[in-house]
UniProtKB/Swiss-Prot annotation:
EC number assigned by the record: 3.6.1.27
Protein name: Undecaprenyl-diphosphatase
Major location category of this protein: membrane
Single GO molecular function: undecaprenyl-diphosphatase activity
Gene behind this protein: uppP
Native organism: Pseudomonas syringae pv. syringae (strain B728a)
Length: 276
């Protein structure tokens, strides 16, 4: 492993960790940054799976007490049973639609222009959602109904389009469906666990021949970096949303998306053929 390869792994690990749980699209940022630093091919597919697992481990660690309470209480506690059922209900739409459409979406939509367009549109929707008057019906994740979970699960499927943002769609969807800001954000984190682990297992099996022993060091750098920066991002976001709205992320999405479109329109960078 040369120094540049290590630097690429470090950069992409930081990008994944910082963006996975913020409503700004980690996939979109990975596509853009990977193209800029020329990190692609079979190694990139396997590498992306590894760094996503690093990010997920950060959320598992951050919410380990809640997870342990649910596991211990599952046999007897109705609250734990309802929470688990809601997660399963919210998870299933992504499973069904992911199996059906994942390859087609990856082939046709995983490019920088799609990412930029989705960033802008998602940012506008986020601003609109934040400026609406919210009527909070559900204060905590334990108070959610199965219909809330199903609606959030369906909204999560929009994130199959790169640039949309899984966390952005589920958080904003949760707010529109009457969840408090804290409940919408936390449920988005919990829903990420089965969704991302499921996607990683599916992709890992599909691309199992691309995992090679000589790439271990590259994967390790990406995994550890992603874990550390995802932990920072999760803790930072939970503190931030206690006193702020998501408007700053919406404006960032719009500005970043327009910048990408401008560089393409004026011919400064040829994004048209950029692929994940």
């Amino acid at each position: 492993m040369d120094l540049w390869t290590a630097a690429q792994a470090l950069i992409l690990g930081v990008v994944e960790g910082l963006t996975e749980f913020l409503p700004i699209s980690s996939t979109g940022h990975q596509i853009i940054v990977a193209d800029l630093i020329d990190f692609g091919g079979e190694r990139a597919m396997a590498f992306n799976i590894i760094i996503q697992l690093g990010a997920i481990l950060a959320v598992v660690w951050e919410f380990r007490r809640k997870i342990l309470d649910v596991v211990v209480g599952l046999p007897k506690q109705q609250q734990a049973q309802r929470f688990t059922l809601n997660l399963l209900i919210a998870f299933m739409p992504a499973v069904v639609l992911g199996v059906i459409f994942a390859d087609t979406i990856h082939h046709y939509l995983f490019n920088a222009i799609t990412v930029a367009t989705a960033l802008v549109i998602g940012g506008v929707i986020m601003l609109w959602a934040e400026r609406r008057e919210h009527t909070v019906r559900t204060e905590t994740v334990d108070d959610m109904s199965w219909s809330d979970a199903l609606k959030i699960g369906l909204v999560q499927c929009l994130a199959m389009i790169p640039g949309t943002s899984r966390s952005g769609s589920t958080i904003i969807g949760g707010l529109l469906f009457g969840l408090s800001r804290k409940a919408a954000t936390e449920f988005s984190f919990f829903l990420a666990m089965p969704t991302m682990v499921g996607a990683a297992v599916y992709s890992g099996y599909k691309y199992r021949d691309m995992f090679r022993p000589d790439d271990f060091a590259v994967f390790a750098i990406g995994f550890v970096t992603s874990f550390i920066f995802a932990m920072i991002a999760v803790r930072g976001l939970l503190k931030f949303i206690a006193t702020h709205s998501y408007a700053v992320f919406a404006w960032y999405r719009i500005a970043f998306g327009l910048l990408i479109l401008a560089t393409w329109q004026f011919g400064w960078i040829d994004w048209a053929s950029a692929k994940a």
